[in-house]
């Protein structure tokens, strides 16, 4: 983990060198000659990355010599992928689950939290199923509480993990003032929901998880994705949610 000076012009580079920055990231399509003047780390990326700005967080893969943008300070819509694994197999999913060991992502995010601007208004965690490695993810959320306490945190989850009281209690014990679980309920009847997520028993686990969260005073947002299988039942689903889950929370 390191801080980089961001440079776009020769003057930017000279100022960074004069200020003794140990690392410089240059957005340029030309050759950079700093021979004899700079002994630190110099990285150059082409102009298509001109969107990078002060306070952004990027992650480097030294093997592939590629980088990913994890966080953009000037964006109001920052989402961090937790995992590509999931125990639902939603028929309309734009990112089907992968059976891969990607637990390293959680470690990367934990290291990134101190770099995120404390004035960030909102941050979303998504997957895969964000609670696949729930203990490590709880540690990430605890880090959010400690490093960016004023930032509203939204977690996209299928909610099934919350059927486990141990997980719900760990979530509650974070005591984050603005933590929200965003959980989809695709239908008011079990077999339709389970068919859509391709997981028998998912509806019962999801509803039980929602009830346990609310029993512990936690914030829950309900989501319904409209498509060919859910749209015909949307009125019935809406009435069922209003009748049976009137205590859920409005979205951010």
Task: Locate the predicted segments by residue.
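Flexible, acidic/Gly-rich N-terminal and inter-domain linker regions that tether
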Residues: 1-76
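A structural signal for the main folded, soluble domain(s) of proteins
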Residues: 54, 81, 85-88, 95-96, ...
């Amino acid at each position: 983990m390191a801080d980089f000076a961001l440079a776009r012009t020769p003057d930017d580079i000279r100022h960074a060198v004069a200020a003794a920055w140990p690392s410089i990231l240059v957005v340029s399509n030309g050759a950079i000659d700093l021979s004899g003047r700079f002994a630190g780390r110099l990285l150059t990326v082409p102009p298509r990355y001109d969107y990078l700005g002060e306070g952004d967080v990027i992650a480097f893969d030294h093997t592939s010599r590629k980088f990913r943008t994890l966080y953009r300070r000037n964006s109001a819509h920052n989402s961090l992928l937790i995992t590509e694994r999931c125990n639902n197999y939603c028929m309309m999913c734009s990112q089907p689950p992968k059976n891969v060991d990607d637990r390293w992502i959680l470690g990367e995010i934990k290291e990134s939290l101190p770099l995120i601007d404390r004035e960030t208004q909102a941050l979303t965690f998504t997957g895969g199923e964000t609670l696949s490695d729930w203990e490590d993810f709880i540690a990430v959320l605890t880090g959010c509480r400690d490093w960016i306490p004023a930032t509203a945190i939204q977690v996209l989850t299928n909610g099934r993990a919350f059927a486990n009281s141990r997980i719900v209690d760990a979530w509650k014990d974070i005591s984050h003032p603005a933590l929200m679980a965003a959980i989809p309920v695709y239908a008011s009847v079990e077999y339709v929901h389970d068919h859509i997520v391709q997981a028998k028993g998912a509806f019962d686990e999801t509803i039980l998880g929602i009830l346990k969260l609310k029993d512990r005073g936690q914030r829950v947002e309900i989501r319904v994705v409209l498509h060919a299988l859910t749209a015909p039942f949307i009125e019935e689903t809406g009435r069922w949610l209003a009748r049976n889950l009137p205590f859920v929370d409005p979205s951010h």
